[in-house]
Amino acid sequence: IIGQSMGGYVGQMYSQMYPYQMRGFIAIDSAPLQRRYVTKLEIWMLKRMTSIYRYCPWQLLLKLGVDGVAISEYGRTLMHEMMMTYDGDKARYARLSGHGSRLLAEAMEADLPYEIQCPALLICGEKDRAGSAIRYNRAWHEETGIPIKWIVGAGHNSNTDAPDEVNRLIEMFIANL
């Protein structure tokens, strides 16, 4: 399973439910689901993101969303296009994004092991500014020994900021399974 950002959480949940079904796991710009990595304040905030998004002006949300996840023009353009599908319906964006954040908080609060029982790789943009992704990935790597590759000059969407490098790492990982 290869998961980027929220997709990495889905991969960890799958691993929790079916621990010996995965042959490999790659988390791209994601973070560990284990409770020990996050603070009470972070969980509290995740549970309230719907309201935060709802009361934040749309143009500010758009700027923070685009600038917060991508460094490259290509990555920023993709994020802008995705967010613009919600232009004029900020409430829908707030509900959807907030719902995902709340589910994430609940998964962390469940305090399940979320152990990866297969070969794994962490990929993270060295300029990732989404939440505390860099801190989480450092700790995840140090505690579990899962190898980590830092993508130079990439943000939270390192697969759009440096697609050739991310694809090369994925191909190498799969070739070594």
What are these model-derived regions, one by one?
Residues 1-3, 28:
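Short beta-strand immediately N-terminal to the catalytic nucleophile in serine-hydrolase-like folds
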Residues 120-154, 160:
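Conserved loop-alpha-helix segment in the C-terminal half of the alpha/beta-hydrolase fold
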Residues 160-172:
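Post-His helix in hydrolase/transferase enzymes
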Residues 36-41, 134-136, 161-163:
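Short aromatic-enriched loop/helix-cap "lid" or pocket-rim segments at secondary-structure transitions
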Residues 12-17, 23-55:
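Flexible "cap/lid" loop of the alpha/beta hydrolase fold
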